[in-house]
Amino acid sequence: MRFLDGHTPAYDLTYNDVFVVPGRSDVASRFDVDLSTVDGSGTTIPVVVANMTAVAGRRMAETVARRGGIVVLPQDLPITAVSETVDFVKSRDLVVDTPVTLSPEDSVSDANALLHKRAHGAAVVVFEGRPIGLVTEANCAGVDRFARVRDIALSDFVTAPVGTDPREVFDLLEHAPIDVAVMTAPDGTLAGVLTRTGAIRAGIYTPAVDAKGRLRIAAAVGINGDVGAKAQALAEAGADLLVIDTAHGHQAKMLDAIKAVASLDLGLPLVAGNVVSAEGTRDLIEAGASIVKVGVGPGAMCTTRMMTGVGRPQFSAVVECAAAARQLGGHVWADGGVRHPRDVALALAAGASNVMIGSWFAGTYESPGDLLFDRDDRPYKESYGMASKRAVAARTAGDSSFDRARKGLFEEGISTSRMSLDPARGGVEDLLDHITSGVRSTCTYVGAANLPELHEKVVLGVQSAAGFAEGHPLPAGW
């Protein structure tokens, strides 16, 4: 990575401050770009879903891992919940999706409550384990909410044995009334569903899998209490990667926590953060972390910078921390501050091996929250920061009322925010398409066949706010 002559920055930069200069390229197609990472996380696209309660759940974990990313489960989850989620994700198919299911006796109201849990647009009606119908929003429109789904389900739908080539499923759906193929096991029971778009994605993305060929998932742990014991429990639960997480990672308790977990020799990549300086990066790697999480205050739900004045513009933080990590054989994840595909590309160009995304994914079908509608009937989901009063209240539920009240006074995050669900990109896979398409194009403009080459070859410039605004498309004439 280098800056254009005369563009060497005299101050720290955000993603908005920077642009990529196109260079000579021998990369013929975006599909020739390898987006897999080399940091040991096992991701085949450089996307990590942040350990936020409003974002990271089992539906998100399954879907993102199937497309090559990885989800970090929040540190507030009990070990039993982590174990159940890990077992669920690792039992999922690498190609077909887990469907929303209903029984024939369920009501239309039940169907409406569940249809938005997945992006498929349909629920499968199951009797004695076998699919007997499909229900969509259109079926439910104008129907009494107490009606039974057996009376409105569509019995004419496409089925195929699980293991059918995705291209064949795509062809089967070409003239189907509903864009959902119901995949069945050899005994005729329901195995999953696959849409036409899902069939296409199966040929583009490579799932992030463990040594046994199962989908990957990560889990977070804090720096308080018996960190080693919890890390051991998370590893035994089946987590593929551990994240030691706190807002201020460059502190003695973090270094002690890293050493405690590293000494267990669990055989898992160890991520720690957050920091924004070379010194902090070096200290965490020397303590035993293999990956350092970079970012203080850039996240959409974070108020740290406005509350404390502490933090650093994210692009410059990633550049400095990535350089320090490379000197020690480590890696960094850019955590927070990405709002467009260009930001992800710039974080990777700066030297990050993966980019953590939180709030951007909160407004999707796969995030854990319920889908809500505003007074204009526009869909949204609620998001909140992990240092907010809402998150702190959940984290301290077992404390005394006095301690809970005292801790509640010290929040650094938004407790409720509406994240709109984009009708054009309602599923997290739609956003992954959006992001990876942008990153692939960036690589072709730079002449990079993979992510290490992107960092090596990229030439950057510094732009004004007007320069950044110029790059925005105009929704109407001027």
From Swiss-Prot:
pH dependence (UniProt free text): Optimum pH is 7.4-7.8.
Residues covered by the CBS domain: 95-152, 153-211
Classification via InterPro entries: Aldolase_TIM (IPR013785), CBS_dom (IPR000644), CBS_dom_sf (IPR046342), GMP_reductase (IPR050139), GUAB1 (IPR005991), IMP_DH (IPR005990), IMP_DH_GMPRt (IPR001093)
UniProt key word Repeat: yes
GO biological process, alphabetically ordered: IMP salvage; purine ribonucleoside salvage
Essential cofactor(s): a monovalent cation
Pfam families the record matches: CBS, IMPDH
Activity regulation (record text): Activity is allosterically regulated by the ATP/GTP ratio in a pH-dependent manner. At pH 7.8, GTP has only a minor positive effect and ATP only a minor negative effect on the activity, however, at lower pH values, the effects of ATP and GTP increase. ATP-dependent inhibition can be restored by increasing GTP concentration. IMP and XMP are competitive inhibitors.
Cellular component, GO annotation: cytosol
Subunit structure: Homooctamer composed of two tetramers. The oligomerization state is regulated by ligands and pH.
Name of the protein described by the UniProt record: GMP reductase
